[in-house]
Amino acid sequence: MTQDEMKQAVARAAIDYVVAGEIIGVGTGSTANFFIDELGKIKDRIKGAVASSEATAERLRAHGITIFDLNDIDSMSVYIDGADEITAQGAMIKGGGAALTREKIVASVAKKFVCIADGSKLVDKLGKFPLPVEVIPMAQAVVARKLAALGGEPRLRVKDGKAVVTDNGCYIIDVLGLQIEDPATLEAQINDIVGVVTVGLFARRGADIALLGTADGVNSLSF
């Protein structure tokens, strides 16, 4: 199977975790987009969705799925999203799509986090994929120096010569070269830096289930 076919396979498999009649959380990115397309086929079975980004909300609406504001609900049964990297313990790097803060917020409300990804995202140790950190724009340089002191190589994420701006009006610093031995500790350490909105480490609230696409089909891991 191609990488896209693997993503489609895990997106279809994730439908089994959708609880009928409830509101579900939906992530952001290419694999999440495949899931949204599958969700559109069963939209009459669910009450609606909470989106982790404006892009996700737009795609959900295009399928006729009702969007709910997270402030209007107390909890949700499941949050389904992709990952840039995931370990055998369920810790993840996320944020390649610049939606890490809202993804982390929505995931925190869900009873279950189902990660969907192609099998190449399963790693022994996090850190080969650059670690995204969302920052307040005026703190960009300050935070970058702090991240460099941790042993990483911080780079402001740019597109077309301009800093990428998140849905929250913030910037993204991608940190290369970090040796992430203890994801939960590093998550707390980076989140404590003044000016950081959040870091794209999902370790303290990692995945509960991972559906990983392989050439032989979908592998399921529980954490």
Swiss-Prot record:
Keywords: Isomerase. Catalyzes the reversible conversion of ribose-5-phosphate to ribulose 5-phosphate. PANTHER family: RIBOSE-5-PHOSPHATE ISOMERASE (PTHR11934:SF0). Homodimer. The keyword Transcription does not apply. GO terms for cellular component: cytosol. Substrate binds at T28, G29, S30, T31, D81, G82, A83, D84, K94, G95, G96, G97, K121. It comes from Janthinobacterium sp. (strain Marseille) (Minibacterium massiliensis). It catalyses: aldehydo-D-ribose 5-phosphate = D-ribulose 5-phosphate. This is Ribose-5-phosphate isomerase A. It comes from the Bacteria. Its EC number is 5.3.1.6. It is an enzyme of class 5 (isomerase). Pathway: Carbohydrate degradation; pentose phosphate pathway; D-ribose 5-phosphate from D-ribulose 5-phosphate (non-oxidative stage): step 1/1. CDD domains: RPI_A. Pfam families: Rib_5-P_isom_A. Belongs to the ribose 5-phosphate isomerase family. Gene3D superfamilies: 3.30.70.260, 3.40.50.1360.
